């Protein structure tokens, strides 16, 4: 039956006649499912802490998971930080009966059957699928809310909900946005204001560059049963708190619509391999907001280089080490690195990651099936639960994902615009300011600002009190070098460096509680 289900779910059903337990998790892993299985016991829970209270053997700490966490890769989505506690992977079901268990993948993305091949047929079908994916997530007896950032994903959701679907809402829609008065480079008011001007919604704002992140981080560390990934959780945390105050139960989120729809990067290799040089030059020229001959040639060289490397990698195993991996390895305790073959794990991750030399279908499949997706969704799920909210993600509807997988590359990227199908399909409801936006906001400047002002004392306290057991995994000297560099010039600190500091703190807190 699970093959016929839609939506977000994790459940277990006892089949008395067959004397077996049937467990399943939704397609993208939005709802979590953890379990432990021994010769004499099977136990499951929606949170790891539900298993930790049982008299079970946790199996010790999973050092491979720590290695992946500290090097910021995700190589699979079944293990946890405990050797004897597992995740039920997305799109899988598990059958348990006397003496045996069966883990089965019931779903992986498959291209949908699309009727018609004209751009108008594609646009009509996307509009219909996206409308339905949004509509079926609006069912509530309480006010419905949505994040609104000014990007095309959240804006599309708000415009569809407050526009064509407004009669499906139980009350006027609420939106939740961050504004940046001090770090203006992160401010998106010029974009999301066009949505607020067009639709009747109740907007709510926070000054995201004045937040003290310590509350969100300390509470999340308490909530999470593992070290967590999300570096920018504090803005979402504060917005969820406002949503709770407004009586919201359903909170819509455009989380990672990029992966669901695809930026269409596979168009470049396809044009190159097909010898369509004029179209390739045109698309290279139109990348970004300031086209130039120099930039065009640079983009063209990058396309040719990526395609050459990708073709070569099929014949020659990847053995080189990208600079960011070499830098990451230097931050680990050398003995930890050696006993867990971390270099090999990094090289495998480099081989398996989405490659810009892939054709569009391969690239899109590689992006949408990354193991990182359910890890991020699990953090969001617990954040929502803490605030009495149900997080809903229309772009992660399986019907929409499979439709986008089937689209030709030129429907995803055209004339310099990525996610072209969204822009064209929803042009009747999207403000031009949104539909014609090419840029994507980088929130790193606000991260460095926050942790050098309101969060400075919190960061210093937690780095200084890093427990000794953390250095079984980290290079202490490197940790403090990064921290000292951040203190001297926070604005020049990369997200990679600041993220490493925050992951170190999360790992330290988790190790202390073991």
Language-model-detected regions and their locations in the chain:
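Short hydrophobic alpha-helical segments that form membrane-spanning helices or hydrophobic packing faces
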Residues: 34-37, 157-158, 261, 401-406, ...
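Short low-complexity, flexible loop/linker segments enriched in glycine and/or proline
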Residues: 218-222, 245, 266-269, 449-451
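Mobile, glycine- and charge-enriched loop segments
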Residues: 213-232, 326-335, 342-346
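Adenosyl-5′-phosphate
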Residues: 53, 83-90, 100, 201, ...
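Cysteine-centered catalytic environments shared across enzyme families
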Residues: 1-225, 236, 428, 433, ...
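Active-site adenylate/phosphate-handling loop in enzymes that bind or generate adenylated species
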Residues: 27, 238-305, 376-400
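Generic recognition of stable, solvent-exposed alpha-helical segments in well-folded globular domains
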Residues: 61, 80, 121, 125, ...
């Amino acid at each position: 039956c699970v093959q016929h289900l839609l939506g977000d779910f994790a459940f277990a059903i006892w089949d008395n006649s067959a004397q077996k337990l049937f467990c399943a998790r939704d397609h993208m892993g939005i709802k979590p499912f953890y379990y432990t299985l021994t010769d004499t016991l099977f136990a499951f829970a929606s949170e790891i802490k539900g298993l930790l209270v049982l008299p079970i053997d946790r199996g010790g700490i999973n050092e491979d998971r720590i290695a992946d966490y500290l090097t910021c890769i995700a190589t699979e989505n079944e293990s946890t930080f405990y050797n004897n506690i597992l995740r039920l992977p997305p799109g899988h079901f598990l059958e348990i009966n006397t003496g045996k268990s069966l883990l089965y993948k019931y779903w992986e993305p498959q291209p949908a059957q699309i009727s018609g091949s004209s751009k108008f047929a594609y646009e009509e079908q996307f509009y219909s699928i996206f409308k339905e994916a949004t509509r079926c997530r609006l069912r509530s007896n309480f006010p419905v809310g949505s994040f609104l950032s000014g990007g095309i994903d959240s804006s599309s959701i708000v415009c569809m909900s407050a526009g064509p679907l407004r009669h499906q809402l139980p009350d006027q829609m609420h939106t939740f946005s961050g504004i940046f008065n001090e770090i203006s480079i992160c401010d998106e008011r010029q974009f999301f204001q066009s949505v607020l001007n067009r639709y009747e919604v109740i907007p709510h704002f926070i000054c995201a560059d004045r937040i003290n992140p310590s509350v969100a981080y300390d509470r999340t560390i308490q909530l999470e049963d593992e070290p967590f990934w999300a570096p920018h959780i504090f803005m979402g945390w504060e917005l969820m708190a406002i949503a709770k105050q407004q009586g919201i139960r359903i909170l819509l989120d455009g989380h990672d619509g990029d992966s669901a729809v695809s930026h269409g990067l596979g168009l470049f290799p396809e044009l190159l391999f097909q010898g369509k040089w004029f179209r390739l030059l045109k698309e290279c020229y139109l990348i970004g907001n300031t086209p130039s001959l120099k930039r065009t040639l640079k983009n063209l060289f990058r396309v040719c280089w990526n395609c050459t490397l990708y073709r070569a990698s099929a014949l020659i195993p990847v053995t080189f080490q990208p600079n960011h991996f070499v830098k990451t390895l230097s931050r680990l305790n050398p003995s930890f690195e050696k006993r867990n073959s971390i270099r090999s794990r990094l090289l495998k991750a480099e081989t398996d990651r989405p490659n810009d030399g892939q054709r569009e279908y391969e690239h899109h499949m590689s992006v949408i099936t990354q193991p990182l997706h359910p890890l991020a969704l699990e953090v969001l799920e617990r954040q929502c639960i803490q605030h009495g909210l149900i997080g809903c993600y229309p772009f992660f509807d399986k019907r929409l994902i499979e439709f986008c997988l089937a689209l030709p590359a030129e429907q995803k990227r055209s004339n310099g615009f990525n996610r072209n199908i969204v822009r064209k399909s929803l042009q009747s409801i999207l403000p031009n300011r949104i539909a014609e936006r090419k840029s994507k906001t980088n929130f790193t400047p606000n991260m460095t600002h926050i942790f050098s002002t309101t969060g400075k004392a919190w960061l210093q306290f937690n780095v200084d009190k890093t427990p000794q057991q953390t250095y079984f995994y980290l290079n202490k000297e490197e940790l403090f070098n990064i921290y000292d560099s951040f203190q001297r010039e926070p604005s020049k600190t990369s997200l990679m460096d600041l993220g490493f500091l925050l992951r170190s703190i999360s790992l330290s807190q988790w190790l202390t509680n073991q």
